[in-house]
Amino acid sequence: MTASHAVHARSLADPEGFWAEQAARIDWETPFRQVLDNSRAPFTRWFVGGRTNLCHNAVDRHLAARAGQPALHWVSTETDQARSFTYAELHDEVSRMAAILQGLGVQRGDRVLIYMPMIPEAAFAMLACARIGAIHSVVFGGFASVSLAARIDDARPRVVVSADAGSRAGKVVPYKPLLDEAIRLSSHQPEKVLLVDRQLADMPRIAGRDEDYAAWRERVAGVQVPCVWLESGEPSYVLYTSGTTGKPKGVQRDTGGYAVALATSMEYIFCGKAGDTMFTASDIGWVVGHSYIVYGPLLAGMATLMYEGTPIRP
């Protein structure tokens, strides 16, 4: 029997014991009292009574051992740019974004819609939401206004985080006009729109609603934003299905179970170790991007490579 077969057999023979062991891969502010509650199957509850935070486990807990280690590499073959962030630098950027969101009125349990290209600020926004207990809903960048409007109406975000434009296959895709039209079509009206200006396209602002990320980022420098400890079963994000088989459906992920499953997969599926680098050819608008561009590698203490471009075009 191979090692992977042995692990699989153990998980089937004693699921509660197995997952209790895997739960030690992350930090818990409050220990869980029950690994698995299947009393309302198939609506299983994981790590009942435990409290944790995705951002803490992806960023903060690594600072003591690897603050200077690379955490996020960003490469854009679209704009011929590259940036890298250590765990300490990532912590600073995420803290700033969290302070901005709080300054715009976002509280625990609020939804934040992220409609962005593959740029570091998109990851900052996701982690910042996790930090303060907000629920992010990432929409694939460049989605048409009608599709975006449907997700705005369903998620009902307090704040939208977006950018002037993305670039794909050498073509600039202006996001702001698509977003403005989507909000015009929506019954729900977000209170604020936070905008990252990449200077790729014109970005007219709507007074009283649109906010400049760069200005806010300077304003909140040095502000400390503690992690909000969430019950294991509280939602971490909502991600919509593509809609190819009907109306898009919002799929909600919990916090504790998701973190433990990801941390476990990084070793047993990907053989990832702290200090390694992982590249996942996906987009944060899809679940693979959530799990294996942003959260999974960081939970494992690895560096993640975020790529703006298409895998088939250099």
Model-predicted segments: where are they?
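A short helix-loop-beta submotif of the ANL/AMP-binding
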Residues: 98, 111, 117-145, 155-160, ...
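Conserved AMP-binding/adenylation subdomain of ANL enzymes
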Residues: 259-277, 287-314
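Conserved AMP-binding/adenylate-forming core of the ANL superfamily
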Residues: 55-56, 72-127, 144, 148-149, ...
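A short N-terminal helical cap/helix-turn-helix that marks the beginning
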Residues: 10-33, 50-73
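AMP-dependent adenylate-forming
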Residues: 36, 58-85, 196-207
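Conserved adenylation A10 loop of the ANL superfamily
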Residues: 79-81, 238-250, 266
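Conserved pre-ATP/AMP-binding loop-to-beta segment of ANL
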Residues: 68-70, 193-195, 207-240, 247, ...
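Structural core segment of the AMP-binding/adenylate-forming
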Residues: 127, 131-215
